[in-house]
Amino acid sequence: MSNPENAQDAMLGNEPAVEPVVEPTAEQHTDTLPSIEEQFRALELKAAEHYDAWLRAKAEGENIRRRAQDDISKAHKFAVEKFAGELLAVKDSLEAALAVQEQTVDSFKSGVELTLKQLVSAFDKNALNEVNPAGEKFDPHKHQAIGMVDSEQEANTVVTVLQKGYMIADRVLRPALVMVAKGK
């Protein structure tokens, strides 16, 4: 059954106002919404923009990689430049010593000593350190044992250094060639 209030409204002719539902026409739809073709074109443009941006980013990445490789190559090529500059003074001293016509043993010896000081100075400036382990405990990372000898020293102690070793910073350039004490 119906509601009594609705019945009264119906008798009095007071019907509730109902708005008619109006369906939009096809023309109204096309005015407010873009067509599929327009949407497709817009998406194609956006895709082209993204593709272009991707290509640019890829090219920039390649350029950065190439520049980094060039920098590394130059660093390798010119890494010894400072050290080589230091060695030029040593070479000049040796050439000057050889150019002297009348040399005595003492003058020759003092010239060689000065040249050795220049070389040691160049080594020091470039973190090239001498390893002279006489009397130290044998370290296989810095020393190369040539043989073992009887000695009064403790076992595995360096007794004789046959050839000094060298290190650049903390890396062994050449291990010291040593003779090591045998166990007692």
UniProtKB/Swiss-Prot annotation:
<dbReference type="GO" id="GO:0006457">
    <property type="term" value="P:protein folding"/>
</dbReference>
<dbReference type="InterPro" id="IPR000740">
    <property type="entry name" value="GrpE"/>
</dbReference>
<dbReference type="GO" id="GO:0005829">
    <property type="term" value="C:cytosol"/>
</dbReference>
<dbReference type="GO" id="GO:0000774">
    <property type="term" value="F:adenyl-nucleotide exchange factor activity"/>
</dbReference>
<keyword id="KW-0346">Stress response</keyword>
<dbReference type="Pfam" id="PF01025">
    <property type="entry name" value="GrpE"/>
</dbReference>
<dbReference type="InterPro" id="IPR013805">
    <property type="entry name" value="GrpE_coiled_coil"/>
</dbReference>
<comment type="function">
    <text>Participates actively in the response to hyperosmotic and heat shock by preventing the aggregation of stress-denatured proteins, in association with DnaK and GrpE. It is the nucleotide exchange factor for DnaK and may function as a thermosensor. Unfolded proteins bind initially to DnaJ; upon interaction with the DnaJ-bound protein, DnaK hydrolyzes its bound ATP, resulting in the formation of a stable complex. GrpE releases ADP from DnaK; ATP binding to DnaK triggers the release of the substrate protein, thus completing the reaction cycle.</text>
</comment>
<protein>
    <recommendedName>
        <fullName>Protein GrpE</fullName>
    </recommendedName>
</protein>
<comment type="similarity">
    <text>Belongs to the GrpE family.</text>
</comment>
<keyword id="KW-0143">Chaperone</keyword>
<dbReference type="GO" id="GO:0042803">
    <property type="term" value="F:protein homodimerization activity"/>
</dbReference>
<comment type="subunit">
    <text>Homodimer.</text>
</comment>
<dbReference type="GO" id="GO:0051087">
    <property type="term" value="F:protein-folding chaperone binding"/>
</dbReference>
<dbReference type="GO" id="GO:0051082">
    <property type="term" value="F:unfolded protein binding"/>
</dbReference>
<keyword id="KW-0963">Cytoplasm</keyword>
<dbReference type="InterPro" id="IPR009012">
    <property type="entry name" value="GrpE_head"/>
</dbReference>
